């Protein structure tokens, strides 16, 4: 088995917990599902029972061979031996994504599924602290994700639910796609704005007078309690001051 910590995995083995997760997914028999990490096929098997088709992507050769043998007679399951970060999700097909992602790749994978897929709903099992970071609009990741998806916790999963037992608790979260808050034509400007904003490099974005106007328009009294909506307002002021709107 691949022992590389970059791809280390902690497996859900409790039938009770797996069933609790399935209940939260709200999948229909017409749904197409892409699963990140087949593992030993426990969740894959349950996904296939309640959806139309499951495509499960697994990098680890040992786990891929193990799950291939276990699921070889299941006509609803297609297994792919590939790194999820290299996988190309379909552009036109309707689908949902489910996965328990390695802690060490959480940021890369969540960016992948949000910005490089068209999934309507994304269900991920992640480390609890990472989930909190996705909600933090004082961080780059939070400000980028919120433009495309809303994020909510569905289920708390204590470390005891996994084998081997990790040092941290996990949560099942749902990312629901919404109409983008930042049109494609402004995306590069937004990522630049965010990189400067989170590092408080305000002088790189505004003159002193512009900054004062942007804060006033967004009704910001305290930068430490600024909301996502206020950041969007400030970004729109940035576009206006730079003749982009």
Swiss-Prot record:
Q: Which InterPro entries match?
A: KsgA/Erm, rRNA_Ade_diMease-like_C, rRNA_Ade_Mease_Trfase_CS, rRNA_Ade_methylase_Trfase_N, SAM-dependent_MTases_sf
Instruction: Could you list this entry's UniProt keywords, alphabetically sorted.
Output: Antibiotic resistance, Methyltransferase, Plasmid, RNA-binding, S-adenosyl-L-methionine, Transferase
Decide whether keyword Protein biosynthesis is in the record: no
Provide the protein name. Answer: rRNA adenine N-6-methyltransferase
S-adenosyl-L-methionine recorded as keyword: yes
A single GO molecular-function term is: 23S rRNA (adenine(2085)-N(6))-dimethyltransferase activity
Q: Quote the cellular component terms of the Gene Ontology held in the record.
A: cytosol
| Family stated for the protein in its record | Belongs to the class I-like SAM-binding methyltransferase superfamily. rRNA adenine N(6)-methyltransferase family.
PROSITE patterns linked: RRNA_A_DIMETH (PS01131), SAM_RNA_A_N6_MT (PS51689)
Q: Which reaction does it catalyse?
A: adenosine(2085) in 23S rRNA + 2 S-adenosyl-L-methionine = N(6)-dimethyladenosine(2085) in 23S rRNA + 2 S-adenosyl-L-homocysteine + 2 H(+)
Provide the species name.
Enterococcus faecalis
Entry superkingdom = Bacteria
One GO process term, biological-process aspect? response to antibiotic
**UniProt function note:** This protein produces a dimethylation of the adenine residue at position 2085 in 23S rRNA, resulting in reduced affinity between ribosomes and macrolide-lincosamide-streptogramin B antibiotics.
Residues given in the record as S-adenosyl-L-methionine binding sites: 10, 12, 37, 58, 83, 100
**Entry EC number(s):** 2.1.1.184
Question: Record's NCBIfam families?
Answer: Erm23S_rRNA_broad, erm_B_23S_MT
Name a Pfam family for this protein: RrnaAD
């Amino acid at each position: 088995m691949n022992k590389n910590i970059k791809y280390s995995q902690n497996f859900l083995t409790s039938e009770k917990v797996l069933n609790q997760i399935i209940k939260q997914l709200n999948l229909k028999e017409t749904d197409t599902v892409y699963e990140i990490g087949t593992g030993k096929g426990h969740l894959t098997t349950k996904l296939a029972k309640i959806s139309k088709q499951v495509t499960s992507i697994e990098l680890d050769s040992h786990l891929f061979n193990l799950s291939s043998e276990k699921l070889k007679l299941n006509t609803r399951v297609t297994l792919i031996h590939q790194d999820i970060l290299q996988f190309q999700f379909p552009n036109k097909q309707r689908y949902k994504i489910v996965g328990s992602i390695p802690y060490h790749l959480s940021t890369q994978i969540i960016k992948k599924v949000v910005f490089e897929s068209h999934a309507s709903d994304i269900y991920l099992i992640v480390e609890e602290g990472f989930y909190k970071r996705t909600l933090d609009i004082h961080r780059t990741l939070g400000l980028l994700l919120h433009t495309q998806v809303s994020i909510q916790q569905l289920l708390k999963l204590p470390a005891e639910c996994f084998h081997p037992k990790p040092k941290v608790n996990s949560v099942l979260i749902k990312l629901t796609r919404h109409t983008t808050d930042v049109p494609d034509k402004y995306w590069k400007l937004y990522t630049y704005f965010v990189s400067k904003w989170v590092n408080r490099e305000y002088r790189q974005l505004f003159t002193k007078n512009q900054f004062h106007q942007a804060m006033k328009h967004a009704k910001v009294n305290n930068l430490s309690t600024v909301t996502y909506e206020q950041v969007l307002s400030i970004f729109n002021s940035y576009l206006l001051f730079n003749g982009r709107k």
